C-alpha cells in the first residue's frame, strides 16, 4: 500500500473515502468500463467484470467512513491473495481533497488477473521387488476463477502399466500385466458454500475453504483381481482465528466392487478373512470432524 500526495496533509488518523478497483486482464487488457455498487466502483475490460462484484466485495474489510486501520488493510490484502486469481494487487491511498484539514483518503486498488489455466504432466517409472516394472503418467488441468466466482475447477487423469520382467514357472509372462486407470474432478471455493449461512459469517478474516470431489478408478492386478472404485467427498475448512482450524466432512462415499477374480486369489482370501473383507465389495458412507490447534 502507498500514500499518494501525503505531503499535502499529514495527520495521525484518516477516514476511508471512496474505493475504486481497476482490474487488468491477464493479457494486459486495460479497463474500458465501470460498474458502481455499494461501497465500490469497479473498472474492468470486456463485457462484464472478470470476477463477480459480490465475491470481490466480501474481501474488503472496511467501509466508507470508517477510521483507517492497518489491521483491516492487512486482512483485506490476505483475503484477496487467498482468491488465487490475481498476478498482483496493490493499494494506493490519496487524500480526497487538498485542503489542509483533509482527513479522508480515497482508496484505489490495481490488480492484474493471473492466467486462467494451470496444467501439469508427470511421468514416472516403477520397479518392484516382484519383478514387475512399468511406466506411469499423471495429467492435471485446473481452471481458475471458474464462472467468475474465484473457484477452481480441476481435472486429473492418471494411469500406470506394469509387466513381469521374468517368466513364471510355467514360462508364461503374458498374463502378468497389471494396470491402473483413474480420473477425478474437483471444485474448490475459497469460502464456505452453505446456503443457510449469513453473508457476515461467510466474510471471514481468516481462511475458509469448500471442496467438492468425485473420483473413479479401475485397478487390475495380474493373476488376482480387477476392481472398480468410485466415490466423492464434500469438505469444509475454516479458521475462526489464526490458530484454530476446523475441518468438517459431512459427506464421504467410497464404493469398491470386484469385477473379476482368479482361482488363486479366491484361494488366498478364503484363508484370510480380514483380507477378504478389505478387498470385497464395499459401500462406505462416512463423515468426519477434525479440530487443529
Q: Which residues does each PLM region occupy?
A:
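Outer-membrane beta-barrel initiation region
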Residues: 12-202, 278-283
Amino acid at each position: 500500500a502507498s500514500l499518494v500526495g501525503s505531503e499535502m496533509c499529514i495527520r495521525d488518523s484518516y477516514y476511508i473515502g471512496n474505493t475504486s478497483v481497476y482490474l487488468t486482464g491477464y493479457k494486459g487488457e486495460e479497463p474500458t468500463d465501470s460498474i458502481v455498487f455499494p461501497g465500490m466502483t469497479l473498472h474492468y475490460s470486456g463485457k462484464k467484470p472478470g470476477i463477480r462484484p459480490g465475491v470481490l466485495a466480501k474481501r474488503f474489510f472496511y467501509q466508507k467512513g470508517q477510521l483507517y486501520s492497518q489491521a483491516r488493510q492487512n486482512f483485506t490484502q490476505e483475503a484477496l491473495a487467498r482468491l488465487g486469481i490475481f498476478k498482483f494487487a496493490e493499494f494506493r491511498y490519496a487524500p480526497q481533497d487538498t485542503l489542509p484539514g483533509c482527513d479522508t483518503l480515497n482508496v484505489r486498488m490495481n490488480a492484474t488477473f493471473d492466467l486462467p489455466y494451470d496444467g501439469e504432466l508427470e511421468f514416472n517409472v516403477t520397479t518392484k521387488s516382484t519383478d514387475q516394472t512399468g511406466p506411469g503418467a499423471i495429467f492435471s488441468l485446473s481452471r481458475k476463477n471458474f464462472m467468475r466466482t474465484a473457484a477452481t475447477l480441476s481435472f486429473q487423469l492418471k494411469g500406470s502399466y506394469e509387466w513381469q520382467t521374468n517368466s513364471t514357472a510355467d514360462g508364461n509372462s503374458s498374463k502378468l500385466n497389471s494396470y491402473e486407470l483413474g480420473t477425478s474432478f474437483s471444485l474448490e471455493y475459497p469460502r464456505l458454500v452453505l446456503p443457510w449461512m449469513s453473508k457476515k459469517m461467510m466474510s471471514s478474516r481468516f481462511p475458509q475453504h469448500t471442496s467438492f470431489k468425485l473420483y473413479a478408478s479401475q485397478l487390475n492386478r495380474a493373476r488376482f483381481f480387477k476392481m472398480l472404485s468410485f466415490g466423492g467427498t464434500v469438505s469444509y475448512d475454516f479458521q475462526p482465528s489464526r490458530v484454530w482450524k476446523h475441518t468438517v466432512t459431512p459427506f464421504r462415499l467410497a464404493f469398491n466392487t470386484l469385477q473379476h477374480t482368479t482361482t488363486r486369489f479366491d484361494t488366498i482370501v478364503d484363508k484370510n478373512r480380514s483380507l477378504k473383507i478389505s478387498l470385497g465389495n464395499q459401500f462406505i458412507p462416512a463423515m468426519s470432524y477434525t479440530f487443529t490447534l
